[in-house]
Amino acid sequence: MSSAAKSPVAPSAHPTALRILLAISAGHLLNDTIQSLLPALYPLLKESLNLSFAQIGLITLAFQLTASLLQPVVGLVTDRHPQPYSLATGMGFTLVGLVLLAFARSFPAVLIAGALVGLGSSIFHPEASRVARMASGGRHGFAQSLFQVGGNAGSALGPLLAALFIAHHAQSRVAWFVVVPIIGFGLLTRVGHWYKAQLSAHHAAARRAAPTAPLPRGKVIAAIA
């Protein structure tokens, strides 16, 4: 069986959905903007909360454990049970983590905030990659490249925004950035609607294509009799 046949929706069966590709790439930009914002805040957090370099390292560890190592687990689960709205759910975790980060007044609070921001990323990426492939219409290289450009742009944008709006200011200014995951939540909810519709169409087509099971011989004989 081909990989396309195993996927929830065979990408080559649909024309390239450029609108969805652009939307999921924009979602990737917004997600990675917040992901790259956290390391850019380390000098501010170190000064405002009097953190040691060891504590900064632990924040990075908590962030990377949830953002990176948890991703394959999420991917395994969603391969078996696709979750169209996990895209928006991931952005929701990022939003909660960002708000907590803005008003954290202790090291444990920052640690939890970093873990939540990382968790949002790990939930977002597996299904976002799947959506990019589904919307590719068979142009997998183009779709993946466009999706990756969004993420790379976000990684570059986060530190720049931190330097412009947060550096040399109060930690609470981080709250200004809640607009980013809020926009992302709305955008990815709409992508989730499209994803859910594609899954429903695929399942309906699979049911129509399934061969009709023959009636048991006993039922046939009973009906004739």
Where are these regions (language model features)?
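Flexible cytoplasmic inter-helical loops of multi-pass small-molecule transporters
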Residues: 177, 190-214
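Cytoplasmic helix-loop-helix junction between adjacent transmembrane helices
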Residues: 113-150
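Extracytoplasmic
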Residues: 23-43, 51-53, 74
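Conserved MFS/SLC helix-loop-helix module at the cytosolic interface between two early adjacent transmembrane helices
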Residues: 69-108
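Residue-level signature of mid-helix packing/kink "hotspots" within the transmembrane helices
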Residues: 36, 64-72, 155-156
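Juxtamembrane cytosolic amphipathic helices that cap and anchor the N-termini
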Residues: 13-24, 213-225
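Helix-loop-helix hairpin linking two adjacent transmembrane segments in secondary transporters
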Residues: 147-194
